[in-house]
Regions:
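Residues at alpha-helix caps and immediate loop-helix transition turns in enzyme cores, especially N-
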Residues: 20-21, 71, 104-105, 135-138
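Conserved beta-strand termini and adjacent loop/short-helix elements that scaffold enzyme active sites
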Residues: 9, 41-43, 123
Length: 155
């Protein structure tokens, strides 16, 4: 069986957001998941082919002025047209580290991915307010759930 690729694109400008990104990777690389290759990239390092060659993606962003991080938006700007015809139905999930409510960021991501015709496979994870250690277990669970679903052929 060919290994499936799960791409994790995470904007992690702080120690806490780096911990969250690492927790997503930790969940996705659970040793019981056998046929999934996890590739984690920063937004600036992500190219259209990274998305096109993946079977699913998890996007992590901060909420910046009620919107997604500029570097995450840059990924969509650079990858939108190269991916548009090649990734329709593409399974994805995302998490937001929101100092406030995260709804503007969520709407923006959902708007762009609707245009791409991607398929949201998990409710968005909104980590709101002051940082809580529970965010890490939620992020780990997100990575585990998406990778296990990909491994099992559910997505």
């Amino acid at each position: 069986m060919n290994r499936k690729k799960l791409l994790i694109i995470a904007h992690a400008p702080s120690e806490n957001t780096k911990k969250m990104a690492d927790a997503v990777v930790k969940g996705a690389t659970n040793p019981e998941i056998e046929d999934v290759e996890v590739v984690s990239k920063a937004p600036l390092d992500t190219q259209p082919d990274d998305i096109i060659t993946a079977q699913a993606v998890i996007i992590g962003t901060t909420e910046n002025l009620g919107y997604m991080a500029g570097l995450v938006k840059d990924v969509f700007d650079r990858c939108y047209y190269p991916c548009l015809e090649k990734t329709q139905g593409f399974p994805f999930a995302f998490y937001i580290r929101a100092g406030h409510d995260g709804t503007g960021t969520q709407r923006a991501i959902e708007s762009i991915t609707t245009g791409l015709k991607w398929r949201l496979i998990q409710e968005p994870l909104l980590c709101r307010g002051d940082f809580q250690e529970d965010f890490l277990s939620q992020c780990e669970n997100l990575g585990l759930t998406v990778a296990a679903s990909l491994d099992a052929g559910i997505i």
